[in-house]
Amino acid sequence: MMKMKINVDKSLIKAVKTGKVIVGANRTIDAAANGSAKMVVLASNCPEDIKKKIQATDIPVLEYEGTSVELGPVCGKPFTIAAMAILDVGESDILAATA
């Protein structure tokens, strides 16, 4: 099976604009634990304790190559984002990033 190559930044922007996402470690952990998240995106510098809590769930995890300082602006936010949950992808193809 061939893995589809997508532009992660563009896909994240589209998910933020057309879907439903939540940001913040605690809210992301909760969404992963209760199954409402379709996918979790973790910045490369996300703290290990947060990564472990999220990876203990069955939710697909995308490890973003950039840091939290880079992930925030990609998502159109004026702050850092270490962890975010995608509840509804909208018109984005972001789920293909973990396929």
UniProtKB/Swiss-Prot annotation:
GO terms for biological process: translation. Keywords: Ribonucleoprotein, Ribosomal protein. The keyword Ribosomal protein applies. GO terms for cellular component: cytosolic large ribosomal subunit. One of its GO terms (molecular function) is structural constituent of ribosome. InterPro entries: Ribosomal_eL30, Ribosomal_eL30-like, Ribosomal_eL30-like_sf, Ribosomal_eL30_CS, Ribosomal_eL8/eL30/eS12/Gad45. PROSITE patterns: RIBOSOMAL_L30E_2 (PS00993). It holds the Pfam family Ribosomal_L7Ae. Belongs to the eukaryotic ribosomal protein eL30 family. HAMAP family: Ribosomal_eL30. This is Large ribosomal subunit protein eL30. It comes from Methanosarcina acetivorans (strain ATCC 35395 / DSM 2834 / JCM 12185 / C2A). The lineage of its organism: Archaea, Methanobacteriati, Methanobacteriota, Stenosarchaea group, Methanomicrobia.
